[in-house]
Amino acid sequence: MIERWTTAVLDTDLPGGWAVARGPDGFLYDDNGALFPRHWLKGQDLPLLAEHGIGHLDGEPVYLLELSARAEVPGCGWKGLRAFMLEGDHTLYKVLGYAAQIGTWAREHRYCGSCGRPMAQVPGERAMYCQPCDLRSYPRISPSMIVLITRGDEILLARSPRFVTGVYSTLAGFAEPGESAEDCLIREVREEVSIEVRNIQYVGSQCWPFPHSMMLGFHAEYAGGEIIPQEDEIEDAQWFSVHALPPLPASRSIARYLIDLYVARRLGHAEPVLPG
């Protein structure tokens, strides 16, 4: 199968192509979506911070215009990345997710973290460079584990105070230096709900551009202990029957995939497809 979207480092001095614009309120869009003819978009009165060539969509080059402030464009509005995730065009979401990660990284690395001098984009490479320090900075990716813990026909789900009201999800957490993904899983489960797990199985991964996580999905079986929610992190955690689940995360998330996959296998239903 031919991929419609492929990432690439493109020369911003070349003409043509499509462009997306990102500002403090998300991405610019109109009735046709978030992709605009690049020459038209660059002709608007936009507070341009930087431009990045990010890849090809259906063979056409795509660029990101990173803005320093909100701008008003006739016939257009602004929409956050999560809203695009929930809509039907998954390819567009992948384009915008990558654009958001590159834009955030470049914005946060305009100055050298060692000497404080301005950094420059490296031609032909996705890197920012400080010549006095001979320091290259590459896009940040933060490895995180996410795990569905099961006990027969029951699954353990939890609520963070930051979740939408009523929604429960799987446990997750960032890996620390020196940890494997499995080490991270065991530690996070102990910290968040005070139980032990066994038979840890890797399921799949998902890029999660909020802002730069790589979610490593696992399934694990309950091994022992009583649920004690971590103060300030877990509002509630409990076992739910696969026949009576609470409101769940968005269908595009790997958290939802882990849940749906286990439920499908327990009930003999068709297995879902892992979101890209």
Swiss-Prot record:
Residues binding Zn(2+), per UniProt: C112, C115, C130, C133
CDD domains hit by this protein: NUDIX_NADH_pyrophosphatase_Nudt13
GO terms classed as biological process: NAD catabolic process; NADH metabolic process; NADP catabolic process
Statement: the UniProt record of this protein carries the keyword Metal-binding: yes
Cofactor(s) of this protein: Mg(2+); Mn(2+); Zn(2+)
Binding sites annotated in the UniProt record for a divalent metal cation 2: E188
Matching PROSITE patterns: NUDIX
Molecular function GO labels: magnesium ion binding; manganese ion binding; NAD+ diphosphatase activity; NADH pyrophosphatase activity; RNA NAD-cap (NMN-forming) hydrolase activity; zinc ion binding
Signal peptide per UniProt: none
Gene3D superfamilies: 3.90.79.20, Nucleoside Triphosphate Pyrophosphohydrolase (3.90.79.10)
Enzyme Commission numbers on file: 3.6.1.-, 3.6.1.22
Entry note: cofactor: Divalent metal cations. Mg(2+) or Mn(2+).
Positions occupied by motif Nudix box: 173-194
Catalytic reaction equation(s): a 5'-end NAD(+)-phospho-ribonucleoside in mRNA + H2O = a 5'-end phospho-adenosine-phospho-ribonucleoside in mRNA + beta-nicotinamide D-ribonucleotide + 2 H(+); NAD(+) + H2O = beta-nicotinamide D-ribonucleotide + AMP + 2 H(+); NADH + H2O = reduced beta-nicotinamide D-ribonucleotide + AMP + 2 H(+)
Pfam families in UniProt: NUDIX, NUDIX-like, Zn_ribbon_NUD
GO CC terms, sorted: cytosol
Role description: mRNA decapping enzyme that specifically removes the nicotinamide adenine dinucleotide (NAD) cap from a subset of mRNAs by hydrolyzing the diphosphate linkage to produce nicotinamide mononucleotide (NMN) and 5' monophosphate mRNA. The NAD-cap is present at the 5'-end of some mRNAs and stabilizes RNA against 5'-processing. Has preference for mRNAs with a 5'-end purine. Catalyzes the hydrolysis of a broad range of dinucleotide pyrophosphates.
Assembly mode: Homodimer.
Protein name: NAD-capped RNA hydrolase NudC
Species of provenance: Pseudomonas fluorescens (strain ATCC BAA-477 / NRRL B-23932 / Pf-5)
